[in-house]
């Protein structure tokens, strides 16, 4: 679970992958600050200018079982350049919500694929057999490729599709890897996670407003 591995990307660059650690809080903040407005919107489905303390606690306080996060680091700068995470729907259940985000200048080179492969392996090791994910409805290539794997899907609010993905027993198959490459600029499974983050930020704001 703590091992660091390397991934060679399609443009020849290398990335280091490992599970998130408690000391990565500042890396999370810095990575968020570097995201473009479009990437932030796709990740959180709402304009978000900064992460609240409560949001950061949620993102970094993980148990590596019901909540897991795999991060990618730039070997040259040690900056965080990508995160894939799952959150189990209920303790020890066999389903989890999944999300992937990649730094703007590391998109479309296979980093999302590498992160997802590692995340699926961790999920399988923890007894998770299915991921739910959210993809924008106009991301046709990703939807078509994911459908080849056998997910059921339904439209949400007209422009979003929820996917139910059966995880492979071993490494992510070629079709799923290709789907992630096709959607490298999109985020899988962000809506449920983003709603929790935005709710936490709103609650924190209300608490401060009503305080002394």
Give short role names for the model-derived ranges.
Residues 1-212:
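Long, contiguous binding/interaction regions
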